[in-house]
Amino acid sequence: MKNLLLKPIKNSKKKFDITPQSAHWKYVGFKLFHLEKGDDIKDKTIFEESIIVFIEGYGEIEVSGKNMGELGSRTSVFEKKPPSGFYIPLQTSWSIKANTKLILAVCSAPGKEGFSPSIIKSDEIKLIERGKGSNKRFIFNIAMEDNPIANSLLVTEVFTPPGNWSSYPPHRHDENDFPNITYLEETY
């Protein structure tokens, strides 16, 4: 990625569209959508799986032609309530219609067969405290290895109190040397 400072896409519901190719990565993709009430978006996974995180607002989700109902758990990310989301396996069409102003994050990575579409309920996501002092932060584990709803995606939301650090102690994920280091591609 030549330019590390990305700016929102103008005049588009899709504000960011980061692909493995555009970032010169192997796996991770990320899209961010800002929808107004009544707007809709449609997409289809091919070789990738996705987790759609409802950052702010509420919307109806349809997966493979089946209405899965309304998702959303907050009107502002700063409410510090857990988000809700939806797991989309590979080769699956999906659409979302905004019932309110809606911000969506679409996290993606290569997938494998054998996983099913599933709702990620906000009341099943627990708040975890990590670190101490100025290194304290709060984590919502949306999809992690202890809740294997996805093949290769790990998705969290982090809240860092004002004046605190989010990534301490210093660490890296640029090689596989388990259990010392694991290779991960991360977006923040």
What residues fall within each predicted segment?
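Hydrophobic, proline/glycine-rich low-complexity stretches
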Residues: 1-42, 49-60
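Surface-exposed beta-loop interaction hotspot
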Residues: 101-162
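Double-stranded beta-helix
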Residues: 79, 137-142, 146-153, 161-188
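Glycine- and acidic-residue-biased ligand/ion/polar-headgroup-sensing regions
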Residues: 46-69, 88, 162-163, 175-188
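Conserved short histidine dyad/triad with adjacent acidic residue
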Residues: 18, 29-46, 68, 158-181
